[in-house]
Amino acid sequence: MPATGVPQSYYAKYAAYLAERSFTALTFDYRGIGRSRNGDLRTSNARMRDWALLDAAAAWRFLGERPKLVVVGHSFGGQALGLLPEPSHIAAALLVGSQSGYWRNWPPLGRLWMWPATHIGLPAVAKLLGYFPGSRLGFGEDLPRGVALEWASWCRHPRYLVGALGVEDAYAQVHARMRAYAISDDAFAPLRAVEALAELYPRSRWETRRVAPQEIGAAEIGHFGFFRERFRASLWRESADWLEEACES
């Protein structure tokens, strides 16, 4: 499941690698993003919850009944598992840069941009332009107005989307093994925010895998690097090994 504003094409090589490892891999675009963008975003009435309740749910139904269903979620993609049609059927989930977006989960320096971004900047720009110009501001692709506004509102709630939507019971249905990658140079998913997400999946079998670029001989990884092919022999192999082991357990 993709991150906010990131098209499925970004994950194509990682998905192909998983297919080489004998997984059936499906990628998709949320409405308003990538190949699911249809016309002027200013006419879109999409909300962020629709990305999970409608788009991810459609991908889920497309896969049909399978003995082992695993999810790889990047950022928002790992936050939304409790909104899937039957979250109790997830066998395992691998999360990359996924976090609770509540602004206070950031360290002091991070709060200096998270608070104004989520309380003022993002809502104001989305309302003024009728969409959020993420492509011009370095935040992936442009976002529909409703997506940007709902995302900002979740970031102002102490329990993020789970509290804002009142879906605690649905998230308690996630019993899967979950591995969350907390990457030391990821400014969009600091460790505290990653661990706060674990609290939103109270019945999951959660583990946090902390990774520093130096550990794998890299200069940087950041929020988006995990899915780069240069990490095929390190992060990709390790994550696929974990998914295989999780499916067997």
Give a label for each model feature.
Residues V211-S249:
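Catalytic active-site module of serine/aspartate enzymes centered on a nucleophile-bearing elbow/loop
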Residues V174, A180-A182:
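Short beta-strand/loop motif that positions the catalytic acidic residue
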Residues N45-G64:
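Alpha/beta-hydrolase active-site loop
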Residues P2-P7:
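Active-site glycine-rich loops that stabilize anionic/oxyanionic intermediates
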Residues W154-A170, A176:
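Active-site nucleophile elbow and catalytic-triad environment of alpha/beta-hydrolase enzymes
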Residues V72-P158:
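Alpha/beta-hydrolase-fold enzymes
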